[in-house]
Swiss-Prot record:
Hydrolyzes ribosome-free peptidyl-tRNAs (with 1 or more amino acids incorporated), which drop off the ribosome during protein synthesis, or as a result of ribosome stalling. This is Peptidyl-tRNA hydrolase. Monomer. It comes from Wigglesworthia glossinidia brevipalpis. One of its GO terms (biological process) is protein quality control for misfolded or incompletely synthesized proteins. One of its GO terms (molecular function) is peptidyl-tRNA hydrolase activity. The record marks D94 as: Stabilizes the basic form of H active site to accept a proton.
Length: 191
């Protein structure tokens, strides 16, 4: 599968990098590190990026450096500038509805309650179709405030599990690009 753009949804990383809600930016940083690349800041358009060759294709790795609810504007501007279709992008984000340690690909994504995804639909239009990689962070126990939960760091135990999950996701992204989505899903979705 050809992915020209891989985006990790994020709040500003200098303020929120280690938080649960910035799991997408963790993923991009880990992926860039795998390819021995350092992200470059585009100050004018508020994002970090780097190009990497995965298999036969180059993919642009991006972390928007804005608040989650306006990530869509950054992504839209990037796709317009580089002539990338929405179905050629993979959006990586945290997911409250998946337990910590679980991740799922979703192809031809159509809706979500995640503010970063809502922002993409707002910028691209409701009929926009793209692919996602959802990384579970679980829900807070004892009906804790969701915003507080999202904007806090995971526990050390959760962080270890999240990092293991991201490592597995990166391997599966390689399979997705170099082979096919069914093979990648079989590996990622296996317990």
């Amino acid at each position: 599968m050809k992915l020209k753009l891989i985006v990790g949804l994020s709040n500003p990383i200098n303020l929120y990098y280690n938080t649960r809600h910035n799991i997408g930016s963790w993923y991009i940083k880990f992926l860039a590190k795998k390819y021995k690349k350092n992200l470059i800041k585009n100050k004018k358009y508020c994002f970090y990026y780097i190009d990497v060759k995965i298999g036969d294709y180059y993919s642009k790795l991006v972390i928007p450096d804005t608040y989650m609810n306006v990530n869509g504007t950054i992504i839209y501007n990037i796709t317009n500038f580089y002539k990338i279709y929405s179905n050629e992008m993979l959006i990586v984000h945290d997911d409250l509805d998946l337990d910590t340690g679980i991740a799922r690909f979703k192809f031809n994504h159509k809706n979500s309650t995640h503010n970063g995804i809502k922002s993409i639909y707002k910028s691209f239009g409701a009929k926009c179709i793209f692919n996602t990689l959802r990384i579970g962070i679980g829900r807070p126990k004892l009906n804790k405030n969701i915003n507080s939960y999202l904007l806090n760091n995971p526990s050390p135990k959760e962080e270890i599990l999240i990092k293991k999950t991201i490592t597995k996701c990166i391997k599966c992204t390689d399979v997705l690009i170099k082979k096919n989505k069914d093979h990648a899903m079989n590996i990622l979705h296996k317990k």
